[in-house]
Amino acid sequence: MGNIFGHLFRVTTFGESHGGGVGVIIDGCPPKLEINVKEIQYELDRRRPGQSKITTPRKESDTCEILSGVFEGQTLGTPIMIWVRNKDARPQDYQDMAIKYRPSHADATYDAKYGIRNWQGGGRSSARETIGRVASGAIAKKILQQYSGVEIVGYVKRIKNLEAIVDPTTVTMEQVESNIVRCPDSECAEKMIELVEKIRDLGDSVGGVVECIVRNVPKGLGSPVFDKLEADLAKGVMSLPATKGFEIGSGFAGTTMTGSEHNDELYTDKLGEIRTVTNRSGGIQGGISNGENIVLRVAFKPTATIRKEQRTVSRQGEETFLAAKGRHDPCVLPRAVPMVEAMVAIVLCDHLLRHYGQCNTLKSENVYGN
């Protein structure tokens, strides 16, 4: 239960951190989409461990294999299976966690629910599960880009109390990828790297915020009431490990404004398109995309597994202490950027297919544009 995401573009992830490998089955991808391993591998390389001095030292190439659904470089319209083998697992590092629960991790809750758990690296609660999401996101990005030139750019906005100054309307992927922390504000990025290294040396961890902007979004994605676009985006990104908050557009800051201050006034541009003067709605109104940029932010807590000794209990309820071993990120933010982008792409791709299935079967004129 809970391993499948989406309606028409359906993603099913499988595998565990220290098992044979992890992967994904993607159902509902349109046929004849040109896709190759290199495009998927590019996104996985942005997510993989061991990529810099501020990420987990676990050495995994995360080399992907496409096992089905693609023939001669094109999708078949049938389920696509992508597989990544685990090659640097060290289950012995987690022996203490077989009997001791990590504070603020999924150990105790998994035991409470299932009565059994894979304590080697956390099993399904490990961030290695997100490999399948990022691989799926690469395909979703390709569909969105081909349809209307959709561009999704995520970046680290804040780590602990260090906040970058970034204009989301102009930020580029090149700026994001110019440093190991994936923060387009180069001056702030240097401070962030220093902070993460300092915290890591103390055996501790830090959290922060990833901001994501989506450009060239088609109008009309999303549905009223239960399937609002922002609700599905929230579900998608909040299903990622370590997430603790979500906001879109003005978010919580909008609560300090009056209606006249917050409303996005309308105008007609030179092409006759209805546009908004401001974008406090974050590109979505009434649960439906309005064609403006979608801007969202996701809060990530500090990594739960740390070397610093903390009080906990055993499976038998006995009070004890745990200084976690193993290899873990002192800050998940740099590797979380492609994860957020992937979930945003999956949600938008799913809604694009749903929109066309409902609204373009019988063509009709729409006064609000295409």
Curated annotation (Swiss-Prot):
Q: Name the chemical reaction catalysed here.
A: 5-O-(1-carboxyvinyl)-3-phosphoshikimate = chorismate + phosphate
What cofactor is this protein dependent on? FMNH2
Keywords (alphabetical) are:
Amino-acid biosynthesis, Aromatic amino acid biosynthesis, FAD, Flavoprotein, FMN, Lyase, NADP
* Listed EC numbers: 4.2.3.5
- Give yes or no: UniProt keyword Thylakoid: no
**NCBIfam families, A to Z:** aroC, PRK05382.1
What quaternary structure, including any partners, is listed in this protein's UniProt entry? Answer: Homotetramer.
**Per its database record, what is this protein's job?**
This reaction introduces a second double bond into the aromatic ring system.
Q: Which PANTHER family match?
A: CHORISMATE SYNTHASE
What is the recorded name of this protein?
Chorismate synthase
Give the gene that encodes this protein.
Answer: aroC
